[in-house]
């Protein structure tokens, strides 16, 4: 694992803090349901709890990995952090100040200071714009650089992300997938952010290109003292870049720990299952071990511990009572009733 430990300074205010953050989406009644209502049915809108009460602190200079299967709420969490999709409840604090209490100018500064890199670089880049404008338009609009220095500014950024500066007049379709993702990275860097949310930023790339882009993220972190929230369904990818790892399942954090701890001493059965899916030389495992069962619908999450239908260690308590995150060791917390059983046996 080629990451650099970034240990929070004791007592230091986190760069970003989430407190009981929730994000709900309302799914309206479809046409068939509305027609049925005319005949006396009582179909009602459904509520999806995409993020169901997340607490998290991110300190300046560290990389937090967020891992989970598709549909677990990790991308929604990233959009909440980037203020693309505001939280339905809870608090988001930036340098100790609540977003709700910020003035309009402070909120704009936050929007510039927290940038997002998306999974599909082709879909996130305007196909009608040249790279010079894709990267350089926003910093000119926000007064970061003058229009006269735009071309020079963009050329420097392109070189920093490993692109030929002479390609500024090209369009996105004239680049490979890895090059397009580098354009997206340069666009984020152009606004001089403090925190970058990387949402499956290498998932659409070939494995060989993934390694190059991951190493680029690490180099840029060292050069610009960046902070990352790195979202991925692949625990192996997150392990390559992260200082701490957050495991999410159906909108909730089930485990959070230093990266080394997650790989050497995972506590939650879901974390253990994610690790079992990873083929690797370290474990001498040659067969793929998928997680049993299907991810439940967030429209109808299971009662109690939402992982219990797929958990090989589920007890009767797991079906009725939702576990809470509890600290097992400094920096390591897990939400599993098995920890109570282990404690009672000691």
Stretches with model-predicted labels:
Residues 42-43, 99-115, 133, 141, ...:
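ABC ATPase NBD coupling module
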Residues 90-98:
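Conserved ABC transporter NBD signature motif
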Residues 190-194:
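A short, proline-enriched helix->beta-strand linker immediately N-terminal to the Walker B motif
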Residues 33-39, 98, 149-166, 275-276:
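Conserved ABC ATPase "signature" region
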Residues 197, 201-205, 209-286:
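P-loop NTP-binding/switch modules centered on Walker-like glycine-rich loops
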Residues 3-4, 8-14, 27-42, 258-346:
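Short catalytic/signature loops enriched in Gly
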């Amino acid at each position: 694992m080629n990451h650099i430990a970034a240990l929070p300074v004791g007592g230091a205010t986190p760069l970003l803090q989430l407190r009981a953050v929730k994000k709900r989406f309302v799914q309206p009644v479809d046409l068939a349901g509305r027609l049925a209502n005319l005949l006396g049915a009582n179909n009602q809108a459904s509520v999806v709890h995409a993020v169901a009460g997340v607490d998290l602190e991110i300190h300046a200079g560290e990389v937090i990995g967020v891992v989970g299967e598709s549909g677990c709420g990790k991308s929604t969490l990233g959009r909440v952090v980037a203020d693309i999709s505001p939280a339905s409840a809870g608090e988001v604090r930036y340098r100790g100040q609540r977003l709700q209490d910020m003035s309009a100018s402070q909120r704009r500064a936050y929007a510039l200071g927290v940038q997002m890199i998306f999974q599909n670089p082709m879909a996130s880049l305007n196909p009608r714009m040249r790279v010079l404008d894709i990267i350089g338009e926003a910093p000119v609009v926000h007064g970061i650089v003058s229009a006269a220095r735009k071309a020079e500014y963009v050329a420097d950024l392109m070189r920093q992300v490993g692109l030929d500066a002479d390609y500024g007049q090209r369009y996105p379709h004239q680049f490979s997938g890895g090059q397009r993702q580098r354009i997206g990275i340069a666009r984020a860097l152009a606004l001089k952010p403090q925190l970058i949310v990387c949402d499956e930023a290498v998932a659409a790339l070939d494995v060989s290109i993934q390694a190059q882009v991951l190493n680029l993220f690490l180099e840029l972190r060292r050069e610009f003292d960046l902070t990352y929230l790195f979202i991925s369904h692949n625990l192996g990818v997150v392990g390559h870049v992260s200082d701490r790892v957050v495991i999410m399942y159906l909108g909730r954090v089930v485990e959070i720990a230093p990266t080394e701890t997650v790989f050497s001493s995972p506590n939650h059965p879901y974390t253990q299952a994610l690790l079992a899916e990873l083929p690797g030389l370290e474990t001498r495992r040659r067969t793929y071990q998928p997680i049993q069962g299907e991810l439940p619908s967030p429209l109808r999450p299971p009662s109690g511990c939402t992982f219990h239908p797929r958990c090989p260690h589920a007890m009767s308590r797991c079906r009725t009572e939702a576990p809470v995150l509890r600290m097992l060791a400094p920096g390591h917390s897990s939400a599993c009733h098995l920890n109570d059983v282990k404690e009672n046996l000691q």
